[in-house]
Amino acid sequence: MLNSLKIANTFESIKHEKISKQTVDKYINYFVDAFILREAKRYDLRGKNEIGALRKYYFLDTGLRNARLNFAYTDEGKLLENVVYNELIYNEYTVNVGTFESIEKDKDNKSIRKTYEIDLFARKGNRLYYIQVTDNINDATTKIREYRPLIMINDQVQKIIVINKPILETRDENGFTIIGATDFLLRFIK
């Protein structure tokens, strides 16, 4: 997944050279045209429309991505999210990155606006899914991070957590589907 603003900021902090977001966008568009990347627009889950400003990009061939990084990038959760995105697209789903805002109180009891993200919002006909993809949910911090947006968005869309473990499909106390990546990719979305 790529975000042009993050790339520009990272380039500046690591290489100590300024590159504009517009230049990064140009290069990303070249990669999209060359079928190296695919764009996933953000979708406001409460407003029910696409948000044009920020986008995520996924690699169409994760092997090329890994080769370019000398197989050194080890965030398996993000790589799995990329694979799940590609498989949904291959199976003719419309896929967006789900977002919504919430007004919350900070520690000083001041109202703050917070944006939450659901990894993938997939649609195909009358099939609608909110999908969180993670390497595992054994760690309490990870579990809270993955569950919180799904709990906060209170509608009838099926909520799924895809885990990079060989587990059988189950439902948890929230009604969320918990499923292993292999089962999800080979059976669930077909």
Language model features with spans:
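Short, positively charged loop/turn segments that connect secondary-structure elements
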Residues: T10-T23
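Short acidic, hydrophobic short linear motifs in intrinsically disordered regions
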Residues: M1-F11
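A cross-kingdom feature that marks ATP-driven nucleic-acid transaction machinery
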Residues: Q22-K190
